[in-house]
């Protein structure tokens, strides 16, 4: 997969990107949710920069928290914050901007870029609101206020694994809907794929209804 040369707030998905499967083995105030935000599409330099910023604050201990703005993600973020504060670690909160209609080669590069740019702009606003809301509900958790925000364009599981490889966190914390039965076995969730494919410890948090 080719890599972009610079981190930009508007970048398109790398062509030929496919989701892996288990078989393949594939300083903010309480009112400021934008402690630090980087938006990249797999750029090593930008990911390394985000990792260094987080590690500088936590002496190398970082917890990566992928979120999709669901109640399950919020529960995972709160759990991760509690854990981070108990061990003097910091958080990198990751959101992967995914275009559901993305098909390699289907659109021209220009059309794809415009479409993903629009989705990325909307995602940034939702990301900001998600973090602002989480901060407002959990004012006692400094880890949430000081979290590094990282927004990456691509396919969720692929990008989560790539970011984990670059950032090298001590662990990942993710939310899950907790499906059971045949639907659970045949479909599988993104959280389950990350658990199976990521070499790092992954904790799954379920939202209490």
Please describe what each predicted stretch is.
Residues 3-11, 22-23, 32, 53-113:
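Small/aliphatic-rich secondary-structure junction motif
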Residues 200-209:
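Short, flexible loop segments at boundaries between secondary-structure elements
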Residues 111-126:
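A short acidic, glycine-rich active-site loop
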Residues 85, 165-166, 196:
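Solvent-exposed polar/charged
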Residues 171-196:
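Glycine-rich, Arg-bearing micro-motifs that act as flexible, cationic patches
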Residues 1-58, 132-172, 209:
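Structural beta-alpha unit
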Residues 108-112, 166, 190-191:
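Short, hinge-like loop/turn segments at secondary-structure boundaries
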């Amino acid at each position: 997969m080719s890599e972009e040369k610079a981190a930009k707030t508007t970048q398109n998905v790398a062509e030929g990107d496919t989701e892996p499967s288990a078989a393949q083995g594939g300083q903010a105030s309480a009112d400021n949710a934008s402690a630090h935000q980087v938006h990249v599409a797999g750029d090593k330099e930008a990911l390394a920069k985000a990792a260094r910023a987080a590690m500088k604050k936590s002496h190398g201990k970082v917890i990566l928290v992928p979120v999709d703005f669901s109640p399950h993600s919020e529960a995972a973020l709160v759990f991760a914050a509690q854990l981070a504060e108990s061990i003097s670690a910091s958080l990198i909160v990751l959101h992967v901007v995914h275009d559901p209609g993305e098909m390699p080669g289907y659109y021209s590069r220009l059309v794809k870029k415009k479409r993903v740019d629009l989705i990325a702009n909307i995602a940034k606003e939702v990301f900001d609101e998600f973090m602002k809301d989480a901060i407002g509900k959990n004012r006692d958790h400094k880890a949430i206020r000081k979290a590094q925000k990282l927004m990456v364009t691509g396919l969720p599981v692929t990008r989560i694994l790539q970011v984990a490889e670059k950032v090298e966190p001590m662990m990942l914390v993710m939310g899950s809907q907790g499906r059971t039965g045949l639907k659970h076995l045949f479909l599988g969730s993104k959280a389950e794929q990350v658990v199976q494919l990521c070499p790092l410890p992954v904790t799954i948090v379920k939202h209490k209804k």
